[in-house]
Amino acid sequence: MAISRAQLLKELLPGLNALFGMEYQRYGEEHKEIYETESSERSFEEETKLSGFGSAPVKGEGSAIAYDNAQEAWTARYNHETIALGFSLTEEAVEDNLYDTLSARYTKALARAMSYTKQVKAANVLNNGFDGTNYPGGDAKALFATDHPLVNGGTNSNTQSTAADLNETSLENAVIQLAGWTDERGLLIAAKPRKLIIPPALQFVATRLLETDLRVGTADNDINALRTNGAIPEGYAVNHFLTDTDAYFLTTDVPNGMKHFERTALTTSMDGDFDTGNVRYKARERYSFGWSDPLGMWGSPGA
């Protein structure tokens, strides 16, 4: 349906002092704090996790050397979505508007809508990250699970066994937990946290935990071990599209974790209808958000 003069009555008459409602600031590309972006030339992308070798055994004198097998563990798949939105203006609405260029105003609103949608979709991977039934990964588990299966029969956990709110103890335990992660054959992988990702409600807690020299909540003169050790070297980032006010997450240095594939970059176009004189504008892009290795992220839903 085209935007006509009926929707723009005040803009057809003199005496209007201001038009407002589309000048709000918008949050930036917050997904870049979480995801690695790659381009894609297919309708979907797949990434397969490989299993290497176990620890080497002792070879006895004169005995045969032991041989091990490598294999594929599982495959993660990214299905790109097409995101598109448009609007149409009648010829008369454009002609009779007394105040500004309608197309310029509403193309800005279109860009705002497309940007907002991308940030919501990016954050929803974390928002739904504890739901393995509806949002499983390549290993058939939720992004955050206590039992990511390994080829050797063991498991890795990238969440808490008992959910806890963000505090000094829970954050220190998360750092310790990462140090115990192994590969598919049980070899330690030296994983470390990089950045704390939080909703707006936890920004002041995060500042006290990561940016003070001394421990918080105590009269003792103890140092802030998280800060002194550089345990979370990139500090924290607020994501305004997280829906759980007490959930918090850590990005890690494990490669091939959280990924954003860009199939088609954002494009805009317009055309005119000869019969009606209406002008149509649209924006369109194709992308996907997801994860390959779940160890690229650690998360807690909070208590």
Task: Locate predicted features.
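Sequence/fold signature of self-assembling virion shell proteins
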Residues: 2-10, 141-183, 190-195, 201-303
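Short low-complexity stretches enriched in small and charged residues
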Residues: 2-4, 37-46, 64-67, 89, ...
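Long, contiguous amphipathic alpha-helices that act as assembly "spine/axial" helices in icosahedral shell
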Residues: 76-132, 196, 281-283
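N-terminal alpha-helical "arm" segments
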Residues: 1-27
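Internal, conserved structured core segments that host functional sites
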Residues: 125-147
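A generic local secondary-structure boundary/capping motif
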Residues: 75, 184-186
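Assembly/oligomerization interface modules of large self-assembling protein complexes
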Residues: 22-83
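Solvent-exposed alpha-helices and their adjacent loops that cap or buttress functional pockets
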Residues: 79, 188-190
